[in-house]
């Protein structure tokens, strides 16, 4: 009976509610990856919003040529592909040692696959528009973006949440945080 009570106490001791409040310094250490990731993700959000707003309105932003608009969309695709490649090769394997959310075939990597299924179609369409093979139609562009927009935005938020201080402190020490690949 004593072992059951000790195990119950140990379980309670590791719940987030029972963790001591982080000092501002500790919070910065534990939240550093979330802050860094959010900088990248905010750029993706800004670019997505510009592209999606134009597609929804049926017109490019004022003063932007067709070529600039299409190239902006292609850069978004290239940057997101590169971002996910870096995560999957250099960051997720380190995090996956202790954090289940970053392991293969779990939520975050599954989201990458779902995003890229739509992103690849979006990119192929823009490449066809850039080459002159297709004419850019904003309704088509919006429909392509709608295929992966929800999972993309969910992923951008989920990843930062997983890297947040309150979650990271469950798995890593401050010393380990200082050695992270970001």
Per-region residue spans from a language model:
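Small-residue-biased structural context
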Residues: 1-182
């Amino acid at each position: 009976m004593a072992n059951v009570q000790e195990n119950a106490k140990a379980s309670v001791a590791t719940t987030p509610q029972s963790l001591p409040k982080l000092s501002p310094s500790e919070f910065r250490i534990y939240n550093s990856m979330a802050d860094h990731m959010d900088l990248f993700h905010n750029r993706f959000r800004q670019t997505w919003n510009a592209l999606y707003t134009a597609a929804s309105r049926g017109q490019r932003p004022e003063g932007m040529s067709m070529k600039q608009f299409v190239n902006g969309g292609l850069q978004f695709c290239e940057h997101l592909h590169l971002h996910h490649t870096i995560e999957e090769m250099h960051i997720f394997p380190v995090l996956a040692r202790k954090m289940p959310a970053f392991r293969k075939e779990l939520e975050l990597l599954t989201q990458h696959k779902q995003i890229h299924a739509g992103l690849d179609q979006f990119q192929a369409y823009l490449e066809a528009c850039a080459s002159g093979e297709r004419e850019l139609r904003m309704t088509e562009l919006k429909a392509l973006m709608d295929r992966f927009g929800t999972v993309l935005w969910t992923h951008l938020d989920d990843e930062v949440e997983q890297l947040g201080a309150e979650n990271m402190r469950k798995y890593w020490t401050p010393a380990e945080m200082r050695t992270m690949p970001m």
